[in-house]
Amino acid sequence: MEKQEDFKLNTHSAVYYHWRVWELTGLMRPPGVSSLLYVVYSITVNLVVTVLFPLSLLARLLFTTNMAGLCENLTITITDIVANLKFANVYMVRKQLHEIRSLLRLMDARARLVGDPEEISALRKEVNIAQGTFRTFASIFVFGTTLSCVRVVVRPDRELLYPAWFGVDWMHSTRNYVLINIYQLFGLIVQAIQNCASDSYPPAFLCLLTGHMRALELRVRRIGCRTEKSNKGQTYEAWREEVYQELIECIRDLARVHRLREIIQRVLSVPCMAQFVCSAAVQCTVAMHFLYVADDHDHTAMIISIVFFSAVTLEVFVICYFGDRMRTQSEALCDAFYDCNWIEQLPKFKRELLFTLARTQRPSLIYAGNYIALSLETFEQVMRFTYSVFTLLLRAK
């Protein structure tokens, strides 16, 4: 039964939900679907929603005259535009996404061949964490969408789901009002699905990288550990040669891990940098909004500002947290090469081990924009910067 479970190991299932979203929103053509029909479907969906939805928000922003309204609309517009840029980036890196899937198949096959229960458990744990992250983001987006709908329903006067400009009179035309709200609801649902995948696939890929590093760490620590099987019918020299071959296989596994990290770096560099820029801009805008509406005692607007501030802060924290986990695991992987039983081994074993240690001394990190490390230290610096800006704005007021 355990062997059957090992055979079913598929770490790419960590991004199963994301892949389905990308297929649904026109980025990845599902198998068996006509290429022409899918292109038409993709262009239609993305033209109607991905392009038109943020343009309507941007147009409304240009017609805003008061500072409080400008800050509120700017917060929503920045968030939506950056979310669409992250979504577009998925299309740009789709070749790398397919390469990751192929590489994961090789690494999964290796884990199944080794067949260690602890390795399999570590990989499945990271898959579950990645899928749980997607479900958490999905719950947040469902709650936000529902809250927007309830807000429109309970308001005594007419109001749109989001402040947008459509060039028609919807205040005095019931037909226009209903049609615009139907479009906004459809666009909001599609955008929420897109954003859910865009916000949760960086931590999902970081979980995959962490899981395979953990599996390799366990594999390396077992190198040179003599078992009852190795003690029976095997000479000491034959055992040492076998251990050397185990090291060579682990070095090949390490090369695959490094290759996976390089591809993930290319995939995550742009969206993570966009998220940092978006968070900084939204946090500063929310601070301005909070300061201006506080005098008007507009508690609803204050709550919305706090929600947006919390949301963008959470998005940065998540990628920094999982990036920090990956760095810690890379350090543990380096330590594993020190902890293996290298003392009894052949000279060529020790030579290969020294070369490998030289390559693993530097901890692995993913960099946003190839510059900003995804770590908890970075998150702390972002929070300090935000507090400094807020204090400066408060004094200026």
From Swiss-Prot:
- List residues traversing the bilayer: 39-59, 73-92, 132-150, 177-197, 273-293, 302-322, 364-383
Kindly report every residue range on the membrane side named Cytoplasmic: 1-38, 93-131, 198-272, 323-363
UniProt keyword Transmembrane, yes or no = yes
Top-level taxon of origin? Eukaryota
Give residue ranges on the Extracellular side.
60-72, 151-176, 294-301, 384-397
Keyword Metal-binding tagged: no
What GO biological process, any one, is recorded here? Answer: sensory perception of smell
Pfam families, alphabetized: 7tm_6
Where would one find coiled-coil regions in this protein? none
Tell me which InterPro entries the record gives.
7tm6_olfct_rcpt (IPR004117)
Q: Which GO terms describe its cellular component?
A: dendrite membrane; membrane; plasma membrane
Additional remarks: The atypical heteromeric and topological design of the odorant receptors appears to be an insect-specific solution for odor recognition, making the OR/Orco complex an attractive target for the development of highly selective insect repellents to disrupt olfactory-mediated host-seeking behaviors of insect disease vectors. Odor-evoked OR currents are independent of known G-protein-coupled second messenger pathways.
Q: What quaternary structure, including any partners, is listed in this protein's UniProt entry?
A: Interacts with Orco. Complexes exist early in the endomembrane system in olfactory sensory neurons (OSNs), coupling these complexes to the conserved ciliary trafficking pathway.
State its role: Odorant receptor which mediates acceptance or avoidance behavior, depending on its substrates. The odorant receptor repertoire encodes a large collection of odor stimuli that vary widely in identity, intensity, and duration. May form a complex with Orco to form odorant-sensing units, providing sensitive and prolonged odorant signaling and calcium permeability.
What protein is this chain from? Odorant receptor 2a
Q: What's the source species for this entry? A: Drosophila melanogaster
